[in-house]
Every structure is written in structure tokens, then in C-alpha cells.
């Protein structure tokens, strides 16, 4: 009956029941009473991530790791990849599955944004191309919230403007988007048209531990300040311990809250 814990990742089958990443486990179990829940094993993820990156370096030194399970490979000048991109990527995908024991999706294109979007087209264990000439057919029909860097809040703003697909976003006057979403509006308009990611995206990922954080899902709704402060104190103690371990100091503290309707405030 406790709602402790959230969904960190879900299988393709669980997704068919409407289970989404970030929702409390008690809600996920309502959607799928027979749900199998496996506790996370972060050290295993780190080890497998390291093995994957080492394998990718066997093919090219130009690797940009975006997260624990995402990386871009620059295959410019790699003759085998240039001659048969789909064949090369399929071979790499199969090798990862065979030697490391997990499946991956690979997207192929001319820039980071399109390769990332290509990798998300259909899962699991797939290879997709998303070249500029394929954008109208493959990317524009997708819901706008599937575009890289369009989160729930931005998607809600776009829906109010009558923008529901990536194609509609691509055809919107960027000045209108800037009026409502500032610089982010023009950035996502560029992405909707297949433009390259901004350099700041990679700069934010280039330095480790620019920020320290911790989060939890409380077992019950909290409506009084004392209980809320106790929860925040517990999180602060964990973050403080990590800061002391790394001999770091901070200048800004932020608190992020999500209520039971998934409305976020910070």
C-alpha cells in the first residue's frame, strides 16, 4: 500500500499499460497489478556504461558521452562506416548485445540532433537513419513533446499555441515562439527543422559534478511545513555528505517539488 519509490525505467511491455518514467510505483501497480518491480543497481549500470564507452572507442576516438546510457560517435573518415552506414551500425548493435548483454538503439545522421531523434524512432534493438531529406516523413508527424529538449512545461505552452506535432513547430514563425518561450523557442524551432544542437548542450555535459542533488518520493501527501522541512533536511544531509567527500562548496541551493498531479514547482 505504500507508494514509496518511482519508476526509473520501464520495459516495452510495461509501456503498453501506460506506465511512464517518474510516476510513483503505487500508480504503476494500479495500471498493471501483475507488475514486476526490480530494484536499481547503479554500480552495474556504471560498469556496463564504462564497458560500452570503451567498446565505442575501438571504432573512433571522437566520442561524446551525453549520459550514462547515451553517446555520440563521429564516424567522419571511418571508411567502413561511410561505405555502409546501416550495415556498420547493425554490426555494432549486435556486437553490443552479444558481448555486453543488453540491446541498444542507434540513430544515423549528419548531426547530433538528428542522430539522437533517429535513435528514438522505434525501440528496442533497432537502427534508424534520419537524414535531412527524411525529416518530413519520419520526424515531423511525431508529437511535439518527443522533440529533444521539449519537456512537459514547454509542450504545454506549445499546445496552447495550437502546436501539437514537430512539423507544426517547424512551420511556426520563430518570432512567435521567441515571444512566448524566449531563446528556447527559437532553439526548438531550429531543432524541429533538423538544425544542430547548440554548443551549450555539450558544454553543460563536459564538466563532471557541476551540481549535486538528491530526490525522493514521500509515502504520503505532505501538507504541513514541519513535515516538508524534515524531508528536505534528509535530502540535504545526503547532498552535504557528497559535498564534503568531494571537498566542494556551493553558492546556490534549489528545491524542486512535484505534487500528486505531476505539477512541478521549483
Where are these regions (language model features)?
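DNA-contacting surface of Y-family translesion DNA polymerases
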Residues: 146, 156-266
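Gly/Gly-Pro- and Ser/Thr-rich, intrinsically disordered tail segments characteristic of DNA damage-repair
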Residues: 1-187, 203, 241
Amino acid at each position: 500500500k505504500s507508494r514509496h519509490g518511482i519508476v526509473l525505467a520501464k520495459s516495452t511491455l510495461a509501456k503498453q499499460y501506460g506506465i511512464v518514467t517518474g510516476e510513483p510505483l503505487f500508480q504503476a501497480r494500479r495500471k498493471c497489478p501483475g507488475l514486476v518491480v526490480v530494484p536499481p543497481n547503479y554500480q552495474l549500470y556504471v560498469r556496463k556504461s564504462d564497458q560500452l564507452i570503451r567498446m565505442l572507442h575501438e571504432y573512433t576516438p571522437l566520442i561524446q558521452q551525453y549520459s550514462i546510457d547515451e553517446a555520440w560517435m563521429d564516424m567522419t573518415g571511418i571508411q567502413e562506416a561511410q561505405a555502409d552506414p546501416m550495415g556498420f551500425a547493425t554490426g555494432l548493435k549486435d556486437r553490443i548485445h552479444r558481448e555486453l548483454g543488453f540491446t541498444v538503439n542507434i540513430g544515423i545522421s549528419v548531426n547530433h540532433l538528428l542522430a539522437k531523434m533517429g535513435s528514438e524512432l522505434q525501440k528496442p534493438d533497432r537502427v534508424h537513419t534520419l537524414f535531412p531529406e527524411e525529416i518530413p516523413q519520419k520526424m515531423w508527424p511525431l508529437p511535439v513533446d518527443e522533440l529533444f529538449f521539449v519537456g512537459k512545461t514547454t509542450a504545454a505552452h506549445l499546445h496552447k499555441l495550437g502546436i501539437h506535432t514537430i512539423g507544426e513547430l517547424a512551420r511556426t514563425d520563430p518570432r512567435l515562439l521567441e515571444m512566448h518561450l524566449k531563446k528556447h523557442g527559437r532553439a526548438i524551432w531550429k531543432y524541429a527543422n533538423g538544425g544542430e544542437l547548440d554548443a551549450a548542450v555539450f558544454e553543460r555535459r563536459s564538466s563532471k559534478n557541476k551540481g549535486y542533488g538528491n530526490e525522493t518520493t514521500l509515502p504520503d501527501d505532505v501538507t504541513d511545513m514541519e513535515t516538508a522541512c524534515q524531508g528536505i533536511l534528509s535530502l540535504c544531509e545526503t547532498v552535504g555528505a557528497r559535498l564534503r567527500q568531494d571537498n566542494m562548496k556551493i553558492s546556490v541551493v534549489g528545491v524542486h517539488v512535484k505534487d500528486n498531479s505531476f505539477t512541478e514547482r521549483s
